[in-house]
């Protein structure tokens, strides 16, 4: 019974929680001790193989690069190294080069169903760079591949919440929204999305024809409106001119002579008047006075 009770007590949650930190501390202590021994042996190897070991221990990274160093599987304190020369211990240190330059990624055409149920094909280009070399290596397996996949998904999701006319007329706004969304999502991967540009929006052929017909109809309607407005202005001008000519007999005669001059110039003909214009005017005035007297009587 005593043996059974001791086994039961060792499996109680309270006992497990109490012994777990101690076991973890012991394992950490053993790992640190083993690590110190390996580091010491590595330094001994460097000293014994001088100066040949310097060819292995010293590395160089370019201005646009950083080196993330792991010692016995753990990140070395101090962050990424570079640019310039840095030192590693043989056999126990490993490092990864990270390029900090801006990269471009052409998002392949994505078939998207817009908010108003129109299928369009949209492609874009994404400009991004590594902003934190250590995080881009330690937090994600492949930061570049993950960013590209996320760019495709973000493009589809963003376009799916917009109407077709918004996609066609608000490209800059949509690009800015995508850039903010991508930058926020990739911050945990050490990636900075600098810019997103929508390259092309391709519509179905039938929709293109329908939009072209609609645009043609709109142009014809505008042309008819402009023509109607022109006719209205011309009619108004003619009415004003007729009022002016009616109030001035001299203006009527001048206009009459101008018309005759135009006719004779076009047809190259001679016009003969049986009566002078003054006599015609006199008869016209006599007729008007006669009609006026009879109307009063």
UniProtKB/Swiss-Prot annotation:
InterPro entries: Band-7_stomatin-like, Band_7, Band_7/SPFH_dom_sf, Band_7/stomatin-like_CS, Stomatin_HflK_fam. It holds the Pfam family Band_7. Residues 1-30 are annotated as: Disordered. Residues 1-13 have a biased composition (Polar residues). Keywords: Membrane, Transmembrane, Transmembrane helix. The chain crosses the membrane at residues 37-57. The keyword Nucleotide-binding does not apply. One of its GO terms (cellular component) is plasma membrane. It comes from the Eukaryota. SMART domains: PHB. Belongs to the band 7/mec-2 family. This is Band 7 protein AAEL010189. It comes from Aedes aegypti (Yellowfever mosquito).
């Amino acid at each position: 019974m005593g043996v059974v009770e001791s086994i039961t007590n060792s499996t109680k949650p309270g006992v497990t929680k109490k012994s777990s930190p101690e076991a973890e501390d012991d394992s950490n202590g053993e790992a640190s001790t083993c690590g110190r021994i390996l580091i010491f042996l590595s330094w001994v190897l460097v000293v014994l193989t001088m100066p040949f070991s310097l060819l292995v221990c010293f590395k160089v990274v370019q201005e646009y690069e950083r080196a993330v160093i792991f010692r016995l599987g753990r990140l070395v304190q101090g962050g990424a190294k570079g640019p310039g020369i840095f030192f590693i211990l043989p056999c126990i240190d490993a490092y990864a080069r990270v390029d900090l330059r801006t990269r471009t990624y052409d998002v392949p055409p994505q078939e998207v169903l817009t908010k108003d149920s129109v299928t369009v094909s949209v492609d874009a280009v994404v400009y991004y760079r590594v902003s934190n070399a250590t995080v881009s290596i330690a937090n994600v397996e492949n930061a570049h591949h993950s960013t590209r996949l996320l760019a495709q998904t973000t493009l589809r999701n963003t376009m799916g919440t917009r109407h077709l006319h918004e996609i066609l007329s608000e490209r800059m706004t949509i690009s800015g929204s995508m850039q903010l969304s991508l930058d926020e999502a990739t911050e945990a991967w050490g990636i900075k999305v600098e810019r997103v540009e929508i390259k092309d929006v391709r519509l179905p052929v039938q929709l293109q024809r329908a939009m072209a017909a609609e645009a043609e109809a709109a142009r014809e309607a505008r042309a008819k409106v402009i023509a109607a407005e022109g006719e209205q202005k011309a009619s108004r001008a003619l009415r004003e001119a007729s009022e002016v000519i009616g109030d001035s007999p001299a203006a009527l005669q001048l206009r009459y002579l101008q018309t005759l001059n135009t006719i004779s110039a076009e047809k190259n003909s001679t016009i003969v008047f049986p009566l002078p214009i003054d006599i015609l005017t006199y008869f016209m005035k006599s007729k008007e006075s006669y009609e006026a007297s009879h109307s009063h009587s």
